[in-house]
Amino acid sequence: MATFIDIDDPADPRLADYVNLRDVNLRKSLEAEHGLFIAEGAKVIRRACEAGYPPRSFLLAPRWIDGLRDLFDGLDVEVFVVSETLAEQVTGFHVHRGALASMCRQTRWSAADLMAARRLVVCEDIVDHTNVGAIIRCAAGIGWDGVLLAPRAADPLYRRAIKTSMGT
């Protein structure tokens, strides 16, 4: 079961995954180094958990707890409960969707999976997060098996790419 922790100090080290989410360069190094990505909003958080991405922690305002309580019941994870003002101080932006989760990255496809796929979208060096998200959304919408991105492409698990791919 989740452990709920009230936090009122923006410098609390337990909030490190959520600091300065607007700084793309900082996020790239932090997320790659720690193997994490940030899911924003209840819909995205649920979808990530359902897809098998394990959460590291959650950051949310009190009014969002009940809407995610069923998800928390099955997880052994820390839920940092903060005011909306504190969430904005920590993240660097107004958290419109009220809930954030630090999620563990995983390798989703093996070479054998790629070889077995009938239809793949292959993208080389698409560097805009919104474009990557739109490509993923379109590929899913027309029933393609997956999207293969070149190493220099924008991160498909960056917040903006995720929001675009889900239409949120």
Residue ranges with predicted function:
Residues 73-92:
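A glycine-rich helix N-cap at a beta->alpha junction
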Residues 55, 76-78, 144:
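A generic structural signal for alpha->beta connector loops
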Residues 1-67, 153-154:
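Boundary-proximal intrinsically disordered activation/regulatory segments immediately upstream
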Residues 101:
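Glycine-rich phosphate-binding loops that contact phosphosugars or nucleotide phosphates
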Residues 67-75, 111-113:
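Short loop/helix-cap segments at secondary-structure boundaries that form the rim of catalytic
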Residues 2, 50, 104-108, 112-168:
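RNA substrate-binding interface of SAM-dependent RNA methyltransferases
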